Amino acid sequence: MILTKDTLRCLFKSNRWKSNTNVENLHFNPNSIDITLSPHYYTYKETYRKVIDPRESNIEDFMVLNQIDDYIDLLPKEFILGSANESFDCSEPIGGIAYVQMLDGRSTLSRLGISIHNSAGFGDYGFNDTFTLGILNNSPYSIRLYKNMRIAQVYFTDLDDSIVLERYQGYGNNKGYPGLPRLGKDRF
């Protein structure tokens, strides 16, 4: 079951669920909340090494942190690792049912050729950080992305009550910065 706007608004207004953004400033849709683009993003460096080996590479050798002043023009086929401004804590079960967050790109941007992907698609139970967003321009044209523009939407869906709930142990406190991939032999 996916929660609707009225239920979400009630949960956040009552502080049963929490957000780092004032509830009056959240962008509620019929069954989701729009999230906005943080000014911080990573791009790939020009480097002599052309292969990233997930078992051996140090990702900091390949990526550089940037900041959007007002906007960036995403070139055709260009990829950036961005982040959302908003974070949500929905770890308190409602009526004995636990919920997780699910992220999708906005259809308007998709129709322009922008793919927004959260590497996991779902936030694990207890996830309460900002989503890291893989943003790719599939269009033959440059597309302008503005700081704080609505970039994706988050849905809240229930978990099967037969599972043992384990709290999220992921990437840590990103707080508006994209989480870089963790590489190394122990990860693959």
Q: Regions from the language model: what does each represent?
A:
Residues M1-F188:
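DUTPase catalytic domain/fold
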